[in-house]
From Swiss-Prot:
It comes from Streptomyces griseus subsp. griseus (strain JCM 4626 / CBS 651.72 / NBRC 13350 / KCC S-0626 / ISP 5235). The lineage of its organism: Bacteria, Bacillati, Actinomycetota, Actinomycetes, Kitasatosporales. GO terms for cellular component: cytoplasm. Mg(2+) binds at residues 219, 243, 247. GO terms for biological process: L-leucine biosynthetic process. This is 3-isopropylmalate dehydrogenase.
């Protein structure tokens, strides 16, 4: 395990600046004294686009490659046309760094606002494919803007891409106590892509006899996320279904404000990126109202990815304890929550 961390920091837009500052505060507090943390901040996002028209210049993309990991705050602003930052920055990073795993843990923490509160058995992970599906830009339109317009959005699925994400999901399931993996797709209608996923899943399953498996159509999975979340341990699915399911998973386990995520390159060829799921919330930016918990939990994912398991667990324990003590009667600022978590992980 490396005894130094070279971290790229992209605060981004809106509340991103505030929550990233708290994530770094907790990171500095939890690391052992013999671990050297170096950070470099990158000015990317809406303000940069307004000033220069740049989203992610090639020079900065090249510089980002040299870091061990990336911590991202939030990207997006209503003053920027939809899709400019999403495709020009976030998706460009994801594809350039081959982040083929989007990792989204879903765990019910104590004292959280959800209709499923009081069910301690909600603890699963969604492994979403990150570089294929309908997000590759494979499509187009004819006779655009006319009553006869035709639009296509093609979902790209390759045997190579599917197998590597399925294999990663089996590895994660094998390392967890329950050792269960569920494939989610819609192979009764999406027969070509669906059969590629199911056949690959079944082939790889033969190499992991210790992992129990099952399959669900995506519509059934959405029902069970709400009615039987305890049935899930690790879930693997494609890019589009995963995008939808992970937000539902966040809702049933306490809300997007507590949801962390990792865009992972498991090979280590490129740095992985970790970020809270929530948006930039420009309506509350700069007011100290943003809860940095999701960013702090993203820091835990980052540490675990880099091999700092004990430190990651301390952050998660601190978050659990902090949430358990919240009663809603006193509103704390962003800084106050970050300070409290930093004290807990350092003690």
């Amino acid at each position: 395990m490396s005894r130094s961390i070279d971290l790229a920091v992209i605060p981004g837009d809106g509340i991103g600046q505030e929550v990233v500052a708290q994530g770094l505060k907790v990171l500095n507090a939890v690391l052992p004294q013999d671990v050297k943390l170096e950070t470099k901040e990158y000015d990317l996002g809406a303000q940069r686009w307004h000033r220069t028209g740049d989203t992610l210049p090639d020079a900065e993309l090249e510089a980002l490659k040299g870091h061990d990991a990336i911590l991202l705050g939030a990207i997006g602003d209503p003053s920027v046309p939809s899709g400019v930052l999403e495709r020009g920055l976030l998706l460009k990073l994801r594809f350039a760094f081959d982040h083929f795993i989007n990792l989204r843990p879903s765990k019910l923490f104590p004292n959280t606002a959800t209709p499923l509160a009081g069910r301690p058995d909600i603890d699963f992970v969604v492994v979403r494919e990150g570089t294929e599906g309908p997000y590759t830009g494979n499509g187009g339109s004819l006779r655009t803007g006319t009553p006869a317009e035709v639009a296509t959005e093609v979902s790209l699925n390759t045997a190579y891409g599917v197998e590597r994400v399925v294999r990663d999901a089996f590895e994660r399931a094998a390392a967890r106590p329950r050792k269960k993996l569920t494939l989610v797709h819609k192979n009764n209608v999406l027969v070509y892509a669906g059969h590629l996923w199911k056949n690959t899943f079944d082939k790889v399953a033969a190499e992991y006899p210790q992992v129990s498996t099952d399959y669900l159509h995506v519509d059934a999975a959405t029902i069970f996320f709400v009615t039987q979340p305890e049935r899930f341990d690790v879930i693997v699915t494609d890019n589009l279904f995963g995008d939808i399911l992970t937000d539902l998973a966040a809702a049933v386990s306490g809300g997007i404000g507590l949801a962390a995520s990792g865009n992972i390159n498991p090979t280590g060829a490129f740095p992985s990126m970790f970020e809270p799921v929530h948006g930039s919330a420009p309506d509350i930016a700069g007011q100290g109202k943003a809860d940095p918990t999701a960013t702090v939990l993203s820091v835990a994912l980052l540490l675990r990815h880099l091999g700092y398991e004990a430190e990651a667990a301390r952050i998660e324990d601190a978050v659990s304890a902090d949430l358990a003590e919240r009663d809603g009667s006193v509103a704390r600022t962003t800084d106050e929550i970050g300070d409290a978590l930093a004290v807990r992980v350092a003690s």
